Design a protein with these regions (language model features):
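Conserved NTP-donor binding/palm subdomain of two-metal-ion nucleotidyltransferases/polymerases, i.e.
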Residues: 1-122, 127-359
Length: 359
């Protein structure tokens, strides 16, 4: 498995364009293993785009597997078209109700991919201007039984697509750092609600700027590490954020914010992964790579898969009690590397319980 994982990484670099040459290790590829890793990490479309660039003699896989991969890639394309339409329509619906919006992650991220239709889509995360009280009150007026948490509220699905309405793009568990993060979002929100892009030929939406995404998506990855687990898909998203624009004008500002938010070492770990796994040149990194943190985070990524769904270490079951026990077990792993965020987690959970009761 370790050998096939290295072949997977070699091929992934070719697929995302950081390596131009077809990796020689591909001659020893077990395509069933590569397929399984791609499926676990939600990178089916990315790898199939790479397969399409290969000469026939390099694709020594069974026809049945190739056809299955092709079919899944075509399904991804259709799903992205559907998600694009949902993002446009939901944004327009809120606009007519008097709310400015910005699509977070998802279809906005897909625009940075060479092939936007190869990204595995999820749901619609839409940042709605107005603050938690106003937005929650509005959603309750539409659908009274939706569940609200600190940063978003559930919303009726649109044509089968799940929608999460955010009044805060993301948050940190440490109260001190979170306060600074929310002030940052308040400071830069105007540009995010105004930065509009076309989604293919289907229509226009507001998406975040690159500078915003460098901070927001890092906090999103961090939150998933603390809560459920992260997969390579989130890191591929961040790779494309890093190469999507000239960072020389924003690097100093981003570094200042990362230090303020207590994310410097975590960012260094992600930069290590960007360099070692994705083959990113040093000129594109936003902070110096941190090998110690990078190896720890990479191990978490490979163990957990997308959203932690494949983590064999989840030994306590899916019940509420099992979830809480798993949380304690995860905190024990994380506290050595991220003590502030980990130790604040129980306090935040208690505070959040009363916050939800008040809504």
């Amino acid at each position: 498995m370790k050998k096939q994982l290295q072949i997977f990484f070699d091929f992934l670099r070719f697929c995302i364009g950081s390596a131009d040459e077809i990796p020689s290790s591909l001659k020893e590829a077990d395509w069933k293993e590569l397929y399984a890793i791609a499926k676990k990490q939600c990178l089916m479309g990315i790898l199939f785009d790479g397969i399409k660039k290969l000469p026939a003699e390099h694709v020594e896989m069974e026809k049945e597997l190739l056809l299955r991969w092709m079919a899944e890639s075509q399904m991804l394309e259709k799903a992205n078209v559907r998600l694009n339409d949902a993002a446009i329509q939901v944004s327009e619906w809120f606009r007519k109700k008097g709310f400015r919006t910005c699509i977070l992650k998802g279809q906005g991220n897909a625009l940075m991919y060479p092939n936007p239709y190869s990204r595995t889509p999820g749901d619609i995360d839409i940042w709605v201007e107005g603050g938690d009280k106003r937005v929650i009150s509005f959603v309750y007026s539409i659908s009274p039984h939706e569940k609200a948490c600190y940063h978003h509220i559930e919303f009726p699905s649109y044509k089968g697509v799940e929608v999460e309405v955010h009044y805060r793009p993301s948050f940190l568990l440490c109260f001190w750092h979170n306060r600074k993060l929310q002030k940052y979002y308040e400071r830069v929100k105007e540009e995010q609600f105004s930065y509009r892009m076309m989604l293919g030929k289907q229509g226009e939406i507001a998406i975040p700027t690159v500078e915003f995404n460098l901070i927001f998506q890092l906090t999103h990855i961090y939150a998933h590490l603390m809560n459920e687990g992260i997969g390579l898909r989130q890191l591929v998203d961040y790779y494309y954020v890093l190469i999507s624009d000239d960072l020389s004008l924003v690097r100093d500002r981003v570094q200042k914010e990362l230090k303020e938010l207590g994310l410097w070492k975590f960012a260094g770990g992600i930069m290590y992964i960007m360099q070692e796994v994705f083959g990113m040149p040093a000129s594109r990194l936003i902070v110096p790579p941190n090998e110690k943190y990078g190896k720890f985070v990479l191990n978490e990524v490979l163990e957990a898969g997308n959203f932690g769904r494949h983590d064999a270490r989840n030994r306590f079951g899916r019940s509420k009690l099992g979830h809480n026990l798993q949380r304690v077990y995860r905190d024990m792993r994380l506290v050595k590397y991220f003590p502030t965020e980990t130790l604040c987690e129980p306090l935040f959970r208690i505070w959040h319980y009363f916050w939800r009761k008040s809504k």
